[in-house]
Amino acid sequence: MNHNKSIRRIGACGINAIILLSLLSCNTVREISIEVLVPAEVTIPEHIQSVAFVNRSYTPWLARNPKDTMARPPEDLYILDTIINNKFFLGLFDALNSSPLFNLEDPITFQFRRSDSSRFPDPLSVENLQYITDSLYTDAIISLEGYRVSDSLTVWDQSNDIWLEPDYYFIEYKFDYIVEGTMQWRIYDGIYGILIDEFITTDTTEWTVYGDSEGAINELPEVVDAYREYAYQRGFDFGMRVSPSWSQVRRFYFITGNKNIRKAGEFAYNGKWEEAAGLWKQEAGSADPEIAAKAAFNLALYSEKKDLLIPAIDWATRSYDLIQEKYTKTYIEILEKRKLNKLKLERQIPLK
Protein backbone atom coordinates (compact mmCIF):
# COMPACT_ATOMS: atom_id res chain seq x y z
CA MET A 1 0.00 0.00 0.00
CA ASN A 2 1.25 3.44 -0.88
CA HIS A 3 0.40 6.05 1.74
CA ASN A 4 0.88 9.71 0.89
CA LYS A 5 0.19 11.72 4.01
CA SER A 6 0.59 15.32 5.02
CA ILE A 7 3.88 15.66 6.83
CA ARG A 8 4.53 18.20 9.55
CA ARG A 9 7.82 19.91 8.74
CA ILE A 10 9.98 21.52 11.41
CA GLY A 11 12.79 23.87 10.48
CA ALA A 12 16.04 22.02 11.03
CA CYS A 13 18.78 23.49 13.21
CA GLY A 14 21.45 21.66 11.27
CA ILE A 15 24.38 22.28 8.98
CA ASN A 16 23.46 22.47 5.30
CA ALA A 17 23.01 18.87 4.12
CA ILE A 18 24.88 19.37 0.83
CA ILE A 19 27.93 20.79 2.62
CA LEU A 20 27.86 18.02 5.20
CA LEU A 21 27.60 15.28 2.57
CA SER A 22 30.55 16.78 0.73
CA LEU A 23 32.71 16.76 3.87
CA LEU A 24 31.61 13.26 4.85
CA SER A 25 32.45 11.92 1.39
CA CYS A 26 36.03 13.13 1.86
CA ASN A 27 36.26 11.35 5.26
CA THR A 28 37.47 14.56 6.88
CA VAL A 29 34.64 14.85 9.42
CA ARG A 30 32.46 12.63 11.58
CA GLU A 31 28.76 13.31 11.95
CA ILE A 32 26.93 13.19 15.27
CA SER A 33 23.48 14.07 16.55
CA ILE A 34 22.87 16.21 19.58
CA GLU A 35 19.65 17.01 21.39
CA VAL A 36 18.60 20.64 21.66
CA LEU A 37 15.65 22.22 23.40
CA VAL A 38 13.45 24.22 21.02
CA PRO A 39 11.27 26.97 22.52
CA ALA A 40 7.52 26.97 22.10
CA GLU A 41 5.91 29.41 19.73
CA VAL A 42 3.69 30.56 22.58
CA THR A 43 5.02 31.70 25.95
CA ILE A 44 2.72 31.02 28.91
CA PRO A 45 3.13 33.93 31.38
CA GLU A 46 4.98 32.95 34.53
CA HIS A 47 2.10 34.05 36.77
CA ILE A 48 0.07 31.14 35.36
CA GLN A 49 0.52 28.25 37.78
CA SER A 50 -2.35 25.97 36.71
CA VAL A 51 -4.05 25.18 33.41
CA ALA A 52 -7.33 23.40 32.66
CA PHE A 53 -8.47 21.94 29.35
CA VAL A 54 -11.85 22.84 27.93
CA ASN A 55 -13.86 21.71 24.92
CA ARG A 56 -16.11 24.51 23.64
CA SER A 57 -16.73 23.07 20.17
CA TYR A 58 -20.35 22.93 19.10
CA THR A 59 -22.21 19.61 18.93
CA PRO A 60 -22.72 18.89 15.22
CA TRP A 61 -25.77 16.63 15.61
CA LEU A 62 -27.62 19.41 17.46
CA ALA A 63 -26.47 22.37 15.41
CA ARG A 64 -28.71 21.82 12.39
CA ASN A 65 -25.92 22.85 10.11
CA PRO A 66 -26.66 21.48 6.61
CA LYS A 67 -22.98 20.84 5.88
CA ASP A 68 -22.93 18.48 8.84
CA THR A 69 -26.35 16.86 8.77
CA MET A 70 -26.53 16.33 5.01
CA ALA A 71 -23.63 13.89 4.86
CA ARG A 72 -24.31 11.63 7.85
CA PRO A 73 -27.18 10.85 10.21
CA PRO A 74 -27.04 12.22 13.78
CA GLU A 75 -26.00 8.89 15.31
CA ASP A 76 -22.95 8.71 13.01
CA LEU A 77 -22.07 12.32 13.75
CA TYR A 78 -22.24 11.58 17.46
CA ILE A 79 -19.75 8.69 17.12
CA LEU A 80 -17.34 10.63 14.92
CA ASP A 81 -17.54 13.72 17.12
CA THR A 82 -16.69 11.64 20.19
CA ILE A 83 -13.70 10.03 18.45
CA ILE A 84 -12.42 13.31 17.02
CA ASN A 85 -12.59 15.22 20.30
CA ASN A 86 -11.03 12.41 22.32
CA LYS A 87 -8.12 12.22 19.88
CA PHE A 88 -7.67 15.99 19.68
CA PHE A 89 -7.04 16.10 23.40
CA LEU A 90 -5.08 12.84 23.62
CA GLY A 91 -2.66 14.21 21.02
CA LEU A 92 -2.46 17.50 22.92
CA PHE A 93 -1.75 15.75 26.24
CA ASP A 94 0.91 13.49 24.73
CA ALA A 95 2.70 16.47 23.20
CA LEU A 96 2.63 18.43 26.45
CA ASN A 97 3.87 15.46 28.47
CA SER A 98 6.81 15.01 26.10
CA SER A 99 8.11 18.45 27.06
CA PRO A 100 9.88 19.67 30.22
CA LEU A 101 7.23 22.33 30.87
CA PHE A 102 4.19 20.17 31.64
CA ASN A 103 3.69 17.13 33.84
CA LEU A 104 0.11 16.03 33.37
CA GLU A 105 -1.25 13.19 35.48
CA ASP A 106 -4.63 11.88 34.32
CA PRO A 107 -5.65 15.16 32.66
CA ILE A 108 -9.36 15.86 32.30
CA THR A 109 -11.12 17.68 29.49
CA PHE A 110 -14.02 19.73 30.80
CA GLN A 111 -17.00 19.87 28.46
CA PHE A 112 -18.59 23.23 27.78
CA ARG A 113 -20.14 22.21 24.46
CA ARG A 114 -22.23 24.66 22.49
CA SER A 115 -25.56 23.98 20.77
CA ASP A 116 -25.37 26.91 18.36
CA SER A 117 -24.26 26.52 14.73
CA SER A 118 -21.17 28.73 14.92
CA ARG A 119 -18.16 26.60 14.13
CA PHE A 120 -15.66 29.20 15.28
CA PRO A 121 -17.11 31.42 18.03
CA ASP A 122 -16.03 34.78 19.36
CA PRO A 123 -13.68 34.68 22.35
CA LEU A 124 -15.17 34.18 25.79
CA SER A 125 -16.31 37.32 27.52
CA VAL A 126 -14.46 38.28 30.68
CA GLU A 127 -17.51 37.25 32.71
CA ASN A 128 -17.80 33.81 31.10
CA LEU A 129 -14.06 33.25 31.35
CA GLN A 130 -14.15 34.15 35.03
CA TYR A 131 -17.03 31.74 35.58
CA ILE A 132 -15.14 28.85 33.96
CA THR A 133 -11.80 29.49 35.67
CA ASP A 134 -13.48 29.94 39.05
CA SER A 135 -15.48 26.73 38.53
CA LEU A 136 -12.35 24.77 37.65
CA TYR A 137 -10.05 26.45 40.20
CA THR A 138 -7.50 27.27 37.52
CA ASP A 139 -5.45 30.25 36.36
CA ALA A 140 -5.84 29.61 32.63
CA ILE A 141 -7.62 27.39 30.15
CA ILE A 142 -6.56 25.81 26.89
CA SER A 143 -9.74 25.55 24.86
CA LEU A 144 -10.77 23.80 21.67
CA GLU A 145 -13.13 26.47 20.39
CA GLY A 146 -14.40 24.72 17.29
CA TYR A 147 -13.57 22.43 14.43
CA ARG A 148 -14.73 21.35 11.00
CA VAL A 149 -13.61 17.99 9.61
CA SER A 150 -14.70 16.18 6.46
CA ASP A 151 -13.57 13.23 4.38
CA SER A 152 -13.72 12.41 0.69
CA LEU A 153 -12.84 9.53 -1.63
CA THR A 154 -11.78 10.10 -5.24
CA VAL A 155 -11.37 7.24 -7.70
CA TRP A 156 -9.15 7.69 -10.77
CA ASP A 157 -9.32 5.23 -13.64
CA GLN A 158 -5.74 4.48 -14.68
CA SER A 159 -6.50 1.42 -16.76
CA ASN A 160 -3.79 0.22 -19.12
CA ASP A 161 -4.77 0.41 -22.78
CA ILE A 162 -2.55 -2.56 -23.68
CA TRP A 163 -3.94 -6.08 -23.97
CA LEU A 164 -1.47 -8.11 -21.96
CA GLU A 165 -2.88 -11.45 -23.11
CA PRO A 166 -5.72 -12.54 -25.34
CA ASP A 167 -8.98 -11.80 -23.59
CA TYR A 168 -7.15 -10.10 -20.70
CA TYR A 169 -7.32 -6.36 -20.12
CA PHE A 170 -5.31 -4.74 -17.31
CA ILE A 171 -7.39 -2.45 -15.10
CA GLU A 172 -5.97 -0.19 -12.40
CA TYR A 173 -7.56 2.43 -10.24
CA LYS A 174 -6.09 5.09 -8.01
CA PHE A 175 -7.95 5.80 -4.78
CA ASP A 176 -7.36 9.06 -2.93
CA TYR A 177 -8.93 9.19 0.51
CA ILE A 178 -8.65 12.58 2.20
CA VAL A 179 -9.50 13.87 5.65
CA GLU A 180 -9.41 17.65 5.79
CA GLY A 181 -10.36 20.05 8.51
CA THR A 182 -9.97 23.32 10.35
CA MET A 183 -9.43 23.64 14.10
CA GLN A 184 -9.50 26.69 16.35
CA TRP A 185 -7.72 26.79 19.73
CA ARG A 186 -7.49 29.58 22.27
CA ILE A 187 -5.51 29.98 25.48
CA TYR A 188 -7.13 32.26 28.06
CA ASP A 189 -5.51 34.00 31.00
CA GLY A 190 -8.12 33.77 33.73
CA ILE A 191 -6.23 36.03 36.12
CA TYR A 192 -6.20 39.07 33.82
CA GLY A 193 -9.16 38.04 31.65
CA ILE A 194 -7.24 38.19 28.38
CA LEU A 195 -6.29 35.98 25.46
CA ILE A 196 -2.78 34.53 25.57
CA ASP A 197 -3.00 32.89 22.16
CA GLU A 198 -5.43 32.28 19.33
CA PHE A 199 -4.61 29.68 16.70
CA ILE A 200 -6.63 28.46 13.74
CA THR A 201 -5.23 25.98 11.26
CA THR A 202 -6.37 23.95 8.27
CA ASP A 203 -4.67 20.60 7.63
CA THR A 204 -5.08 17.63 5.32
CA THR A 205 -4.10 13.97 5.58
CA GLU A 206 -4.23 11.86 2.43
CA TRP A 207 -4.02 8.13 1.80
CA THR A 208 -3.41 6.83 -1.74
CA VAL A 209 -3.60 3.25 -2.97
CA TYR A 210 -3.50 1.64 -6.41
CA GLY A 211 -5.04 -1.55 -7.74
CA ASP A 212 -8.26 -3.13 -8.92
CA SER A 213 -11.45 -1.64 -7.57
CA GLU A 214 -12.18 -4.32 -4.97
CA GLY A 215 -8.67 -5.11 -3.80
CA ALA A 216 -7.27 -1.60 -3.49
CA ILE A 217 -10.10 0.04 -1.63
CA ASN A 218 -9.73 -2.49 1.18
CA GLU A 219 -6.22 -1.15 1.77
CA LEU A 220 -7.56 2.24 2.79
CA PRO A 221 -8.11 2.86 6.50
CA GLU A 222 -11.56 2.58 7.99
CA VAL A 223 -13.28 5.94 8.31
CA VAL A 224 -13.08 5.95 12.11
CA ASP A 225 -9.39 4.99 12.04
CA ALA A 226 -8.63 7.78 9.57
CA TYR A 227 -10.40 10.31 11.77
CA ARG A 228 -8.55 9.00 14.83
CA GLU A 229 -5.16 9.43 13.18
CA TYR A 230 -6.04 12.84 11.77
CA ALA A 231 -7.40 14.26 15.03
CA TYR A 232 -4.57 12.88 17.17
CA GLN A 233 -1.92 14.49 14.95
CA ARG A 234 -3.71 17.84 14.94
CA GLY A 235 -3.90 17.85 18.73
CA PHE A 236 -0.25 16.83 18.98
CA ASP A 237 0.77 19.61 16.60
CA PHE A 238 -0.99 22.22 18.72
CA GLY A 239 0.64 20.83 21.85
CA MET A 240 4.06 21.27 20.25
CA ARG A 241 3.14 24.89 19.55
CA VAL A 242 2.59 25.72 23.21
CA SER A 243 5.39 23.77 24.86
CA PRO A 244 9.18 23.56 24.45
CA SER A 245 10.33 20.31 22.88
CA TRP A 246 13.50 18.31 22.38
CA SER A 247 14.84 17.93 18.86
CA GLN A 248 17.69 15.90 17.36
CA VAL A 249 19.99 17.99 15.15
CA ARG A 250 22.99 17.06 13.02
CA ARG A 251 26.49 18.31 13.72
CA PHE A 252 30.01 17.27 12.72
CA TYR A 253 33.62 17.60 13.87
CA PHE A 254 36.93 17.28 12.06
CA ILE A 255 38.91 14.06 12.39
CA THR A 256 41.81 14.77 9.98
CA GLY A 257 44.60 17.32 10.01
CA ASN A 258 47.51 16.24 12.17
CA LYS A 259 48.23 13.62 14.83
CA ASN A 260 46.46 15.48 17.64
CA ILE A 261 43.35 16.18 15.54
CA ARG A 262 43.15 12.49 14.61
CA LYS A 263 43.72 11.36 18.19
CA ALA A 264 41.12 13.82 19.48
CA GLY A 265 38.69 12.46 16.90
CA GLU A 266 39.10 8.99 18.37
CA PHE A 267 38.59 10.34 21.87
CA ALA A 268 35.35 12.03 20.79
CA TYR A 269 34.17 8.90 18.98
CA ASN A 270 34.59 6.93 22.21
CA GLY A 271 32.74 9.55 24.26
CA LYS A 272 35.86 11.06 25.84
CA TRP A 273 35.02 14.64 24.97
CA GLU A 274 37.08 16.23 27.75
CA GLU A 275 40.24 14.52 26.50
CA ALA A 276 39.38 15.51 22.93
CA ALA A 277 38.84 19.13 23.96
CA GLY A 278 42.24 19.20 25.65
CA LEU A 279 43.96 18.27 22.38
CA TRP A 280 41.84 20.67 20.34
CA LYS A 281 42.79 23.52 22.67
CA GLN A 282 46.45 22.72 22.07
CA GLU A 283 45.94 22.88 18.31
CA ALA A 284 43.76 26.00 18.37
CA GLY A 285 46.98 28.00 18.68
CA SER A 286 48.73 26.18 15.83
CA ALA A 287 50.78 28.20 13.37
CA ASP A 288 48.99 26.28 10.61
CA PRO A 289 45.73 28.21 10.07
CA GLU A 290 43.94 25.15 8.67
CA ILE A 291 44.75 23.08 11.77
CA ALA A 292 43.86 25.94 14.10
CA ALA A 293 40.56 26.54 12.27
CA LYS A 294 39.57 22.86 12.53
CA ALA A 295 40.45 22.76 16.23
CA ALA A 296 38.46 25.94 16.93
CA PHE A 297 35.48 24.58 14.99
CA ASN A 298 35.57 21.38 17.03
CA LEU A 299 35.77 23.36 20.25
CA ALA A 300 32.66 25.26 19.17
CA LEU A 301 30.82 21.94 18.93
CA TYR A 302 32.25 20.82 22.29
CA SER A 303 30.95 24.03 23.87
CA GLU A 304 27.54 23.68 22.24
CA LYS A 305 27.22 20.13 23.57
CA LYS A 306 27.72 21.58 27.05
CA ASP A 307 25.10 24.26 26.26
CA LEU A 308 27.78 26.98 26.52
CA LEU A 309 26.54 28.95 23.55
CA ILE A 310 28.57 32.15 23.94
CA PRO A 311 31.90 30.25 24.07
CA ALA A 312 30.64 28.16 21.15
CA ILE A 313 30.04 31.31 19.10
CA ASP A 314 33.47 32.65 20.08
CA TRP A 315 35.22 29.46 18.95
CA ALA A 316 33.24 29.26 15.70
CA THR A 317 34.01 32.92 14.97
CA ARG A 318 37.69 32.29 15.63
CA SER A 319 37.60 29.39 13.18
CA TYR A 320 35.94 31.58 10.54
CA ASP A 321 38.49 34.36 11.06
CA LEU A 322 41.23 31.86 10.26
CA ILE A 323 39.58 30.14 7.27
CA GLN A 324 36.45 31.65 5.71
CA GLU A 325 34.44 28.48 5.11
CA LYS A 326 30.74 28.62 4.26
CA TYR A 327 29.87 25.83 6.70
CA THR A 328 31.52 27.75 9.56
CA LYS A 329 29.50 30.85 8.76
CA THR A 330 26.35 28.72 8.69
CA TYR A 331 27.26 27.22 12.06
CA ILE A 332 27.76 30.67 13.57
CA GLU A 333 24.27 31.64 12.37
CA ILE A 334 22.82 28.48 13.92
CA LEU A 335 24.53 29.20 17.23
CA GLU A 336 23.33 32.81 17.23
CA LYS A 337 19.77 31.58 16.71
CA ARG A 338 20.18 29.06 19.52
CA LYS A 339 21.40 31.85 21.80
CA LEU A 340 18.22 33.84 21.10
CA ASN A 341 16.14 30.70 21.60
CA LYS A 342 17.78 30.13 24.97
CA LEU A 343 16.70 33.58 26.10
CA LYS A 344 13.17 32.72 25.03
CA LEU A 345 13.36 29.38 26.84
CA GLU A 346 14.37 31.14 30.05
CA ARG A 347 11.00 32.92 29.92
CA GLN A 348 9.16 29.65 29.31
CA ILE A 349 10.78 27.21 31.74
CA PRO A 350 13.27 27.53 34.59
CA LEU A 351 16.73 26.68 33.25
CA LYS A 352 19.68 25.83 35.46
Question: Which sequence ranges carry the predicted segments?
Answer:
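C-terminal/domain-edge helix-coil "capping" segments
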Residues: C26-I48, F175-T182, R186-A295, L299-K352
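Mixed-charge, low-complexity intrinsically disordered segments
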Residues: T69-E75, D81, S150-I178, E206-V209
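Short, compositionally biased leader-like segments
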Residues: D139, D151, G271-E274
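Catalytic micro-motifs at enzyme active sites that drive phosphoryl/nucleotidyl and oxygen chemistry
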Residues: A40, N128-I132, D167-F175
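Short loop/turn motifs at secondary-structure junctions
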Residues: G14, H47, Y137-A140
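Sec-dependent bacterial lipoprotein signal peptides
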Residues: M1-C26
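N-terminal segment of the mature soluble domain
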Residues: V54-Y147, Y327-T330, K339-I349
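Short linear interaction motifs
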Residues: S33-E35, P121-V126, W163-D167
